[in-house]
Amino acid sequence: MKRRAPIAAALSFAAFASIVPTATAQSQNLVIIDQDGFKSEISGSQTGYQLSLSAKQRGYEQGIRAIQDGARHVATIRQYGRDNGAAFNQSGRRNSGFLGQAGFYNSAAINQAGRGNLAGVAQMGRGNSASTNQTGSYSALGVVQVGDGHAAEVTQSERGEVKLVIQGLNLFRW
């Protein structure tokens, strides 16, 4: 009985930690999240300077939400499966983010506010959608969708903006 108590405590802590949002408020921190399954959700929030967040999900009907406030942040989100949704919001200067999805009927949303930000969306499969919004000057974004039935919405305001949208490429054959 005494040996089972630490194991039960560790398992309950692991279960609790998998649903608690991740938050940091310093500089040069890194958060890495890797999740498999069905109907899971990841929520991360970072405030500070030069922070990194990397999240990966495999499965279906999953969601990722990341929020970064400050400067020089990096967000990388990858999802594999179907009916998944991912979004990240970044505010500040010189932030960058990448959102990649492979599968069917996935949705991606990026919102960046500030100066000198960079955003990228890559989707492969069928029926995926992407929405990107950048407010601020001297920012760039790119959307690449490979497969059929995709939708993309790109909104940029201010000056010095660069955007690239590529849609409808056939699936690559190796």
At which residue positions do the language-model features occur?
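Polar/acidic, low-complexity leader/linker segments enriched in S/T/G and N/D
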Residues: V20-T22
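N-terminal, post-signal-peptide region of Sec/Tat-exported proteins
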Residues: Q46-G81
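A short, polar/proline- and glycine-enriched secondary-structure boundary/capping micro-motif
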Residues: A55, I77, F88, L99, ...
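Surface-exposed, polar helix/loop patches in the mature regions of secreted/periplasmic/lumenal proteins
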Residues: G85-V144
